[in-house]
Amino acid sequence: ITAHPSKPLLYITATGGDPGKVPGAVVFLKKDGSYQKHQNINFNDGACYLSLDKENRHILGVSYGNGRLNVYRLDEQGIPGKAVTTIDEGKREAHCVLLPPDGKNVYVPYVKGNLALLQYAYDGKTGKVTPLEPKDAKPPLGSGPRHMAYHPTLPMVYFSNEQGIGLSSYRREANGQLKVEQDI
């Protein structure tokens, strides 16, 4: 689930279903925050995590089951259309997708046996996602980066770790690459 930051909308999706027909909904809220109505929509894949880009032009989702990243363009009312980008790296257990404050990159952490932290350039106008080189930021062995948060003023990204039950901090370089600073 995620909320639109400037419209009274919530986005929800199931975690499973037939490809391209995964049930989801846009929930319209009343002024007091209560449910007004909803509109059923279909997503390519079930998403364990949804987030919007900086300009609120696209909603991004990652699937824990098949590991795919999907980017959907939003119309003027905030309703997702068909995916404009789908990335399938052949990994499972993606856990989160959350763009940095400048909106220029996408980072997708994978846990368990698929240990990876994939990094991409992001074009907020088109929703296009392009791998950085190297694509994998190589999280510390046994860490399992799960969810992330950005420092409000510094180029730092923090990940909670599922396997290591800890915290890893990364410095975000000017080119978008993540470099491990601490693993505690």
Residue ranges of predicted features:
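Beta-rich, blade/repeat-based domains predominating
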Residues: 1-5, 19, 43-58, 88-105, ...
